């Protein structure tokens, strides 16, 4: 039953997202950092958190006070499934950009939100491209973005 509810919510989320892509695109023309921040807030508060709630997931975070809030950091999430990604993202501070495998960059709506949130896509089969991706991480870190 929960699967059906989550699927229905994802459909509703996709419908609501369509006009927001345009709105956030326009915002990004004037302030790219504002677009990234608002995109992260929307995806987190109206995407990931409700999906976790509807799925019956309850998170308990210990040591949140140890998470850096005002300086750049690199977080590495060791995840085995998609829910680990949702749980990790909802606990990360803003602004946070993520590194994801390049295959996720081919999923239409997901890749758009990830690009809006300054996420990077990593080709795990090409070592040179992977090193190039990691060298681009330096730029967001110098702008006080968190990287996960």
Where are these regions (language model features)?
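Soluble catalytic domains of membrane acyltransferases
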Residues: 54-148
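A transmembrane-helix-recognition feature enriched in membrane-embedded lipid enzymes
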Residues: 1-60, 112-113
């Amino acid at each position: 039953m929960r699967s059906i509810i989550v699927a229905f919510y994802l459909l509703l989320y996709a419908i609501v997202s369509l006009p927001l892509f345009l709105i956030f695109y326009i915002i990004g023309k004037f302030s790219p950092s504002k677009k990234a921040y608002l995109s992260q807030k929307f995806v987190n508060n109206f995407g990931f958190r409700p999906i976790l709630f509807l799925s019956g997931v309850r998170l308990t975070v210990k040591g949140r006070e140890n998470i850096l809030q005002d300086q750049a950091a690199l977080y590495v999430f060791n995840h085995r499934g998609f829910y680990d990604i949702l749980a990790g993202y909802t606990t990360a501070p803003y602004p946070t950009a993520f590194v994801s495998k390049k295959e996720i960059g081919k999923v239409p709506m997901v890749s758009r939100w990830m690009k809006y949130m300054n996420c990077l896509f990593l080709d795990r089969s090409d070592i040179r491209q992977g090193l190039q991706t990691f060298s681009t991480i330096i730029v967001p870190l110098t702008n006080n973005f968190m990287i996960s």
